[in-house]
Amino acid sequence: MTTIKPMLAHKLDKTRIDWDKPVYMQPKLDGVRCLIQYEVFPISQGGARIVAYSRTGKEFMNVDHIKNDLVHLFEACPWIVLDGELYNHNLRDNFEKIISLVRKQKPTYEDRAEARIWMQYHVYDYTGKDYGSFEGLGYRDRLDNLTCSDMYTPSVCYVESKRVKSMKAANDFHARTLAKGYEGSILRTDTPYKHGRSFGLMKFKDFSDKEATIIGYDVGQGKRTGTLGKFVMQDDDGVEFGCPPGKGYNYKDLANILNNIEEYIGKRATFTYFERTKTGSYRHPLFKTLRNYE
């Protein structure tokens, strides 16, 4: 399968913004990045079909309801590659629920039924298999095409995009998205789609995501006796730190983690933090999930 490397965001750099040109803001979704395209395989591999995959090229197998909704789009535009997020704002405080649906590689009938209820695809950009033909297409034109598209359904969602003309307007938008429960905001400039990091895509975020390795744990105390208290993690620079579970984990979840702790030790995990300390550690780190879905 020929996969596309998605455009990735830099942290906000105000010097990269030209306010004389179009600038757009979108809510930042705390979901799983997903690209969807039409691909022709050998008959022995099932022939032509729509595929959904992660930014590292891992195919998602529990999103048939989304792919079915996009059949008409890919019949008309087989060259397009949609870029978006597997997300549901009703699960904004339960990231692990999204992950549990996404990581199913051999979904059962019940898994697919649950995915139809909860899993949405939020589309915020697109590119094409023939990247060269998109070299001069800025985000304003791509956004116009997304806005006018008839592909949207209850499972395929349009991501709100608003043009802003000043840093104050961008900050106001960011404050509103936080108030609505989003994890941050994305700022887009009117630049072509780029595979890899691009200053055409910058993120406003009070908390940052990072990966580290779980090397140990502490058990819960008091009311949390019998559950996980926190993980002990080590980042790629060798910094060790305690990392308690974040939002979305209840008593039963934490007890289950403790009972199966060997499945976590040595694994890569995503955590959030507010900022780095002067000694290089992390302020307010919180465990999100194992990094085993991409």
Give residue spans per PLM region.
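Covalent nucleotidyltransferase
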Residues: R16-Y152, Y293
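Classical nucleotidyltransferase
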Residues: Q26, V32-W79, G84, R197-E294
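Short, solvent-exposed polar/charged micro-motifs at secondary-structure junctions
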Residues: C34-L35, L91-I98, S133-F134, S166-A175, ...
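Short helix-to-loop capping/linker segments positioned immediately adjacent to catalytic or ligand/cofactor-binding
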Residues: Y109-R112, Y131-F134, E160-T177, G220-G222
